[in-house]
Structure formats: C-alpha cells, structure tokens
Amino acid sequence: MTADVNVVIDHSEYTILVVDDVVSNVLLLKVLLTNEKFKVVTANNGKDALVQAAEKQPDLILLDVMMPEMNGFEVSEKLKANPVTQNIPIIFLTALNTTSDIVKGFKVGGERFYFKAFQ
C-alpha cells in the first residue's frame, strides 16, 4: 500500500500581505505564495502597508523591518494600535538577527521573527 503524497491544500480563502521595499523580495514571496494558492497583496513601504492592511484585511502580514521612512517595527506598532488591524498576525522577515531586534519585534506585536535567507 502506498500513501498519496500529492495532497493539494486549497489556501485560496487566505490573503497574505507581503511588505518589503526590495521589489525582488516581494516578487519572490508573491510567486511562492501564489503557487501555494494564497491570495497575495503587496506593499513596498510602511505607509502603503498600513493602507493595504486596513482595506484588504489580510489573514497574515509578512513584514520587512528595514525600510525607509517607516520601518517594520513602526508599522507593527501602528497596526496593533488600530482596532481594524490589531488582530492581524505579523511575521517579521528581516536581515536583522540580534537578540535586541528579536525582542523588539515581539514587543511591537510580531508573532514570529524569521531571518531572510535571500537578499
């Protein structure tokens, strides 16, 4: 007897907001997530992320930290302070890897903190 390992999971009801100022990172994540059937919304800066999160109400936000004008920590604080977006889970994807960065990520509302394996 063999097991069927080609199980397809339908993620099409879930929307993920990808936020990064590096366009190639956004495109890579968008391709990977859409291949898994997620709906993907993108933003290239913190201000757009706040607008997209409020308008689209994603199920998850993948958020870069190092962005110009408004960094990911500031975005997270604003999202968590807004009743419309405060319950959206946030995962930080970043090149930052110090203990203080990780602690700060959790303090400002991040659920997880992952280091980018890509640039």
Regions found by a protein language model. Give the residues of each.
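Active-site residues of response regulator receiver
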Residues: 20, 64, 94
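Two-component/phosphorelay signaling modules centered on CheY-like receiver
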Residues: 23-41, 55
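Receiver (REC) domain active-site loop signature in two-component systems and cognate sites
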Residues: 67
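Acidic, metal-coordinating helix/loop segments flanking the phosphotransfer/catalytic sites
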Residues: 4, 17, 42-60
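His-Asp phosphorelay/catalytic-motif detector in bacterial-type signaling
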Residues: 12-13, 57-59, 84-89
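Non-catalytic signal-transmission and effector/linker regions of two-component phosphorelay proteins
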Residues: 1-15, 30
